[in-house]
């Protein structure tokens, strides 16, 4: 299985998947930590977190998969939602909460 297939399997295996630097309990960058906090603020109690620092192939592969140059990257129901700035904007506009409701509820 190549890295793109592995990523496709990861983003479709769970409803909410976050590619981040570090873990939700110990984020390794401010943007990843902020995205985790926004998910928690939206009432997403459980999500799959993929630590890109643990796997260099995933770290580079996720950028090609989404055609997005940075991490973190949020996926809901297999669809790329965005990075930290987009997730924050969506939260501020109430869009992230709506997306969460349709994904979880």
Predicted regions span which residues?
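Thiol/disulfide oxidoreductase modules built on the thioredoxin-like
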Residues: 64-70
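Short secondary-structure boundary/capping segments
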Residues: 8-9, 88
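Acidic beta-strand-to-loop metal/phosphate-binding motif
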Residues: 19, 73-77
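TIR-domain catalytic/interaction hotspot
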Residues: 5, 59-61
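Flexible, polar/low-complexity N-terminal or interdomain linker segments that lie immediately upstream
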Residues: 1-8
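Non-catalytic, surface beta->alpha helical segment in thiol-disulfide oxidoreductase systems
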Residues: 76-105
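Local sequence-structure signature of Cys/Sec-based thiol-disulfide redox active-site neighborhoods
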Residues: 9-46
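Thiol-based oxidoreductase modules, predominantly thioredoxin-like and allied folds used
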Residues: 44-59, 69
């Amino acid at each position: 299985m190549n890295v793109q297939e592995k990523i496709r399997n990861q983003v479709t295996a769970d409803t909410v998947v976050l590619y981040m630097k570090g873990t939700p309990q110990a984020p390794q960058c401010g943007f990843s930590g902020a995205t985790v906090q926004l998910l928690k603020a939206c009432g997403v109690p459980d999500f799959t977190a993929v630590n890109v620092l643990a796997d260099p192939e995933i770290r580079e592969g996720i950028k090609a998969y989404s055609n997005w140059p940075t991490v973190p990257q949020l996926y809901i129901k297999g669809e790329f939602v965005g990075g930290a700035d987009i997730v924050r904007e969506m939260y501020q506009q109430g869009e992230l909460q709506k997306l969460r409701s349709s994904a979880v509820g």
